[in-house]
């Protein structure tokens, strides 16, 4: 049960992914031969750790605090997230514009052409699910998460993360990191630092990140985690 808590789940997921990477390395995989690294949401920290930009200890500490700050940012039950399946990004952006009033309803993850995740106030997200189905979504599913991640409700968590990430020792990654918030690669330390802070409230542009890889000629991807 303790592992389901965000403050414990985040470093645990990262550690599991790094353990898998170490197993692959024993079989001959070399990350320095990769063209890019990328990670979805907290996976971005795993990617940075894997590429030598941050230490395992720092990644675990930052993710634990990230989980605590995210959990504390919004009272339990106030926020929610939902996956919308079967509508593209343009459709969902139109939906969000119609739902938003005095409550938060934002796109948190642009995962693939027909899977977009919303985040915000629970009542707004529930309305969005109903609206999505009326627009032809195959499914609109509330997600079993403890907080509404990657939306402006996470602003208090973002503020708390600024000091932590500002003081984080970051080295130049051995291969470029494709950032969640920009969907383009960088090895610039201050750019990485800024993107990690913006990621707390920002959209995970995963579909665009994968498209960037495809357009860059990537034909083989190692998915770890």
Residue ranges and their predicted role:
Residues 1-92, 143, 220-224:
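FabD-like malonyl-/acyl-CoA
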Residues 51-203:
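Alpha/beta catalytic cores of group-transfer enzymes, especially the acyltransferase/condensing modules
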Residues 117-120, 125, 212-216, 225:
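Long hydrophobic alpha-helices with heptad-repeat/coiled-coil character
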Residues 1-34, 163-224:
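Acyltransferase/transacylase module recognition
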